[in-house]
């Protein structure tokens, strides 16, 4: 699944790059240079190249809206088909991970929470820079209702962020971090026990 998503995003980046160089005298090589060190090419890298070329002074501004706002007549895109959310949950758990929904307030994902809890959603991101106090209270209350983990963070993207937020300005409280670590330990024990039961069952079958 991860390879499929990576490939789709790579193709989308290439298509968008071609559309950009048709509009502006920048090279694909320069755009790719701006994405050096990244796992993929993103809109911010394209804006970085356009900044270098003198077409804008900021990553997020009028030109960004002109190129990447769906309502703009100059909108350029290459839609990426993402995996089904249930497949994503299964993949996270199969890899030994904990599935947490990122900033539900920003994407208005509240209705989806109730749907995903039975499918194995483990937690919700409560503390996020763009979530107001009332939104945080709402998310936390939902997490308590469904006995979900709670996390937080700055959503730090370095220079590629619309609002500069230094690392550590929005953190997961210690009690939530402890719950997260304890949950991980519990899951590991459950997985180990399940593997032992499978091995014992196979041993009996082969006896």
Describe the predicted segments one by one.
Residues 7-34:
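Conserved phosphoryl-transfer catalytic core
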Residues 23-27, 56, 149:
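Short coil/loop linkers at secondary-structure junctions
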Residues 36-98:
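Conserved acidic, metal-coordinating active-site core of Asp-based
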Residues 3-14, 37-40, 82:
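Short, amphipathic alpha-helical segments
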Residues 2-5, 80-101, 105-207:
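Charged catalytic cores and adjacent phosphate/nucleic-acid-binding surfaces used
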